[in-house]
């Protein structure tokens, strides 16, 4: 049995390190890396099990340029919504593989802590429960895995929490205090639930690892790149310069635009996301934050 992680960023590297403990696991990316177990894309695609840790915005392009056998088994470990199409990642994969052949990974998990082998709990979601169990069996003992069938809920929670983490970083950057941050996160959870419910996500998903768990982690720590984006926005830094300095992908930025567009099309009330996007477009963080604090819902 051979596994390949597609994507050699921090998260992909962390997954590779964890999975290679008990299995033959390779890692690959578009560009050559000086990494142990690194293989070409062609060699990676010869593996039966593929784990995708690419940027959500680059996923479709990668899938179009590289042939995936429809019999291959896939775990989607990226978290985001494609900005251009407003499609969830599972919808993108459906253009290339049957839904029975992929699962979605979610849950509170900083790459740095996984690489340190610190205790971590993850959720694997898919309609093929046997495949979920198979992927769960690949992980070492320090990673506890749970399985369910709520693919859409896992996708939405994983994407939405990144935007809420930016909002939380803005709140902390403005030194509004712990009370304000707690209010923002809890109201963000309600907003995320409202959005997800429209698309058929299950209620319990929002209170589990992929929902409240991942939201709390991502919205409260400087280990979160999305949270750090919010901190810098609160210092009146321009988004372009923040992202250039970050030198990593902050999925919440593009995802915020996608959620805003979807919410407008479907008539879903998403005040936090709307204000985050307004800040991206030049609105002052002080004005946007005051608007949120005055909301009655």
Swiss-Prot record:
Quickly give the catalysed reaction.
sn-glycerol 3-phosphate + NAD(+) = dihydroxyacetone phosphate + NADH + H(+); sn-glycerol 3-phosphate + NADP(+) = dihydroxyacetone phosphate + NADPH + H(+)
Q: Which keywords has UniProt assigned to this entry?
A: Cytoplasm, Lipid biosynthesis, Lipid metabolism, NAD, NADP, Nucleotide-binding, Oxidoreductase, Phospholipid biosynthesis, Phospholipid metabolism
Binding positions (sn-glycerol 3-phosphate): 79, 107, 109, 161, 214, 224-226
User: Which residues does the annotation say bind NADPH?
Assistant: 11, 33, 79, 111, 225, 249, 251
- Pathway(s) it belongs to: Membrane lipid metabolism; glycerophospholipid metabolism
Q: Mind listing the GO molecular function terms for this protein?
A: glycerol-3-phosphate dehydrogenase [NAD(P)+] activity; NAD binding
Q: Which GO terms describe its biological process?
A: carbohydrate metabolic process; glycerol-3-phosphate biosynthetic process; glycerol-3-phosphate catabolic process; glycerophospholipid metabolic process; phospholipid biosynthetic process
* Gene3D superfamilies (alphabetical): N-(1-d-carboxylethyl)-l-norvaline Dehydrogenase, domain 2, NAD(P)-binding Rossmann-like Domain
Q: What class of enzyme is it?
A: oxidoreductase
Q: Name one GO cellular component term.
A: cytosol
EC no.? 1.1.1.94
* Localization annotation: Cytoplasm
Q: Which PANTHER family match?
A: GLYCEROL-3-PHOSPHATE DEHYDROGENASE, GLYCEROL-3-PHOSPHATE DEHYDROGENASE [NAD(+)] 2, CHLOROPLASTIC
- UniProt function note: Catalyzes the reduction of the glycolytic intermediate dihydroxyacetone phosphate (DHAP) to sn-glycerol 3-phosphate (G3P), the key precursor for phospholipid synthesis.
> This chain belongs to which protein, by name?
Glycerol-3-phosphate dehydrogenase [NAD(P)+]
Q: Which organism is it from?
A: Campylobacter jejuni subsp. doylei (strain ATCC BAA-1458 / RM4099 / 269.97)
Which gene is transcribed and translated to give this protein? gpsA
